[in-house]
């Protein structure tokens, strides 16, 4: 995105014609002229004498006429005001630059060195500066206008004749460096001398003057002047889509420029920029960043030793979905930068644990209390192992149950079951240690069951296990297609592609075949396949930036007014929150009515209930139930808990601690008791009253301070 447009890249002076056109299109020729005069003041000269490589390279040239940059330059020269600099604003430098010659190159050097504050001793012939410009075809009025920019500079003129070498000794006695016109290239010159290249085109001559003046300036500052880049043009690497752009003809020529025609011509500029990654990414839109600029900010944030890390939230808010990489013509992998940044900042203790602690505790719960690994009853090992993932068990446990029973009844050799988390949560959080631990646990259980074929119901789980383990998992949609799918639906439906399948075209194709086999006709969304937007769950966005997560969900849901099918349960959950008519393809296949959107406490409860039910009904095992307090929640409190990421189990723990200590403060105004308990790194406070039916909770909040 930060690459120069084609017109700038093709110009030896690298004039910012894109910005000039934007301002001229608004009728603001004064500011447009100011943009151009930052590079060169000779606007009449460019408008009349430049061969305009910018126009030939303009992308509009492919559809009609390129934007006439010379018209814009002429209008800026005519209506952009004087280019004279305030001489009081130019800091004076003590050193003197000698300049020899009587051509356009010397005028360019006068401008470049004069604006830097140097005193210039110009050894020239009989030609006046005005005559130098009129020799290029400018009128006296135009020449005077262009030369107005040199007013206020400290320029002293001395006579010289070409071929007379005596000036060298004279000028070098007074000056600190010598800049010489290409006309003197054949003469013997001192080492402290910089000579022009001898270009013929106007833009190249002025670019050469800029190059020589910069070398002289660096020499006078004692800096390395050998690495100064020579004038050059290049082909722009900026990707510009022409979708929806229609060609047009130039409005007017340079000879007939008016404010109106110039404004109309400038409006033909399409303001070339690459926004491919931003189009479908609410995150980049929200933070108003392009990936390169964001990476600079991330680098600076990581480099801070003492002080506030202001970009932490931006780093943690990326969903790491890979859409921007897929959309980028150059495959720029911004999500990987965010992932590495999180990991490094966690390792160096620059990332506070509060950002992702709740999600990491949820992973710990899935792989501890909610974990289950069993072979099918009657089998000591498994030919297959069903791994539905933590989100499916949390959002739609009935679907997991029906899917397992269906697979175990149709596949031979025994189908094992593993309930747990693949570790993607800890990978997103930058916790490589927890990620490795989760993968090792899965690997061990897989080996215990005889290294069966793993069947995943979650595309992210499948991607993680495929990339980081030896399991070689298959998607459940692929297995069911091979077994045969019953036609249970009709009509059209769109598919929200999962981020976990963004790089897996085969999986996306299989899902579409599966949906068609169910009886639905697939209607592709505007942004689908590898360019599908994230639902807003990836990268733990709901925990780091809930508001942005909801915006992403709304953006994804807004792609269709009809039914949207998902093959990721997190997508189904997020789209449901956004009000979309949506269900998971397995819910559709097994006739499960989508159960709505469970809150954070409900998600954990669903995992436990599923585990208990399967153990009881399939493996005939009973789990001792933990005795719970009778708690009634006042209206609105459950929503408050979910919004503040406080679990009902946390409330249970606080009230159990109260029963042991009887420590509470009384809110006399409302008649509440307020008690607290520290669980892990968080102190929870609960407002409650006691009734005949149990505790009535009227509110809760938390913080990370320790109360002593």
Give the predicted meaning of each segment.
Residues 57, 67-82, 175, 212-225, ...:
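Short, structured interface segments
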Residues 221-268:
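Mid-to-C-terminal Rossmann-like scaffold of FAD/NAD(P)H-dependent oxidoreductases
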Residues 184-189:
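Flavin (primarily FAD) binding-site architecture
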Residues 604-605, 609-708:
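Ribonuclease/tRNase effector modules and their secretory precursors
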Residues 195-223:
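A conserved FAD-binding loop/helix module that cradles the flavin
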Residues 134-141, 391-477, 500-519, 523-616:
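Cofactor-cradling patches in redox/metallo enzymes
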Residues 5-7, 18-170, 288-471, 608-617:
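Iron-sulfur-cluster electron-transfer modules
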Residues 174-183:
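Short hydrophobic core segments
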């Amino acid at each position: 995105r930060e690459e120069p447009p084609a017109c700038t890249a093709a110009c030896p002076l690298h004039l910012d014609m894109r910005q000039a056109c934007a301002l001229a299109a608004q009728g603001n020729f004064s500011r447009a002229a100011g943009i151009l005069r930052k590079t060169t003041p000779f606007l009449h000269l460019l408008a009349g004498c430049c061969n305009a490589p910018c126009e030939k390279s303009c992308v509009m040239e492919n559809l009609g006429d390129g934007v006439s940059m010379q018209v814009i330059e002429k209008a800026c020269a005519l209506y952009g005001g004087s280019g004279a600099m305030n001489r009081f604003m130019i800091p004076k430098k003590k050193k003197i630059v000698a300049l020899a010659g009587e051509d356009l190159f010397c005028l360019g050097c006068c401008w470049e060195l004069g604006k830097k504050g140097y005193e210039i001793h110009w050894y020239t012939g009989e030609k006046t500066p005005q005559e130098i410009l009129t020799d290029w075809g400018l009128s006296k009025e135009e020449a005077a206008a262009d030369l107005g920019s040199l007013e206020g500079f400290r320029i002293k003129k001395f006579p010289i004749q070409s071929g007379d070498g005596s000036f060298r000794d004279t000028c070098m006695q007074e000056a600190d460096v010598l800049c010489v016109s290409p006309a003197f290239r054949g003469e013997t010159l001192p080492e402290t001398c910089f000579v022009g290249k001898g270009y013929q085109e106007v833009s190249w001559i002025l670019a050469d003057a800029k190059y020589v003046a910069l070398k002289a300036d660096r020499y006078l500052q004692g800096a390395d002047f050998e690495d100064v880049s020579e004038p050059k043009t290049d082909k722009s690497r900026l990707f510009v889509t022409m979708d929806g752009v229609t060609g047009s003809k130039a409005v007017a020529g340079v000879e007939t420029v008016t404010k109106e025609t110039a404004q109309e011509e400038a409006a033909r500029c399409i303001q070339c920029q690459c926004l491919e990654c931003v189009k479908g990414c609410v995150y980049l839109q929200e933070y108003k960043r392009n990936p390169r600029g964001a990476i600079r900010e991330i680098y600076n944030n990581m480099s801070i030793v003492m002080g506030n890390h202001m970009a932490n939230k931006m780093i943690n808010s990326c969903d790491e979905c890979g859409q921007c990489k897929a959309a980028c013509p150059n495959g720029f992998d911004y999500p990987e930068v965010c992932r590495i940044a999180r990991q490094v900042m966690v390792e160096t203790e620059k990332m506070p644990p509060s950002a992702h602690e709740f999600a990491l505790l949820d992973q710990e719960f899935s792989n501890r209390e909610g974990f289950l690994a069993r072979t099918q009853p009657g089998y000591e090992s498994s030919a297959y192992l069903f791994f539905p993932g933590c989100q499916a068990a949390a959002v739609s446990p009935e679907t997991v149950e029906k899917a397992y029973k269906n697979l175990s009844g149709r596949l031979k050799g025994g189908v094992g079951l593993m309930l747990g988390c693949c570790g993607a949560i800890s990978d997103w959080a930058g916790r490589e240690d927890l990620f490795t631990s989760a993968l090792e646990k899965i690997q061990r259980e897989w080996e215990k069951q005889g290294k069966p074929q793993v069947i995943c119901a979650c595309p992210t789980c499948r991607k993680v296990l495929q990339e980081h383990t030896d399991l070689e998992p298959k998607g459940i949609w692929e297995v069911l297609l091979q077994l045969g799918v019953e036609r249970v639906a009709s009509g059209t439906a769109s598919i929200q592609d999962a981020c976990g399948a963004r790089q897996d075209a085969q999986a996306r194709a299989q899902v579409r075949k599966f949906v068609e086999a169910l009886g639905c006709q697939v209607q592709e969304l505007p942004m689908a396949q590898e360019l599908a937007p994230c639902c807003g769950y990836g990268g733990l966005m709901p925990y780091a930036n809930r508001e942005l997560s909801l915006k992403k969900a709304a953006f994804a849901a807004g792609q269709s007014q009809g039914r949207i099918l998902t093959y990721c349960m997190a997508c189904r959950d997020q789209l449901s929150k956004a009000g979309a008519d949506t269900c998971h393809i397995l819910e559709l296949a097994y006739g499960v009515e989508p159960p709505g959107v469970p809150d954070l406490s409900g998600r954990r409860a669903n995992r436990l209930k599923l585990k208990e039910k399967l153990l009881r009904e399939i493996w005939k095992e009973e789990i001792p139930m933990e005795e719970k307090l009778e708690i009634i929640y006042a209206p609105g409190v459950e929503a408050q808990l979910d919004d503040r990421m406080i679990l009902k189990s946390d409330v249970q723990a606080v009230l159990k601690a109260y029963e042991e200590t009887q420590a509470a403060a009384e809110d006399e105004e409302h008649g509440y008791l307020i008690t607290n308990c520290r669980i892990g790194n968080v102190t929870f406070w609960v407002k409650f009253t006691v009734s005949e039916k149990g505790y009535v909770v009227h509110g809760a909040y938390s913080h990370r301070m320790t109360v002593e």
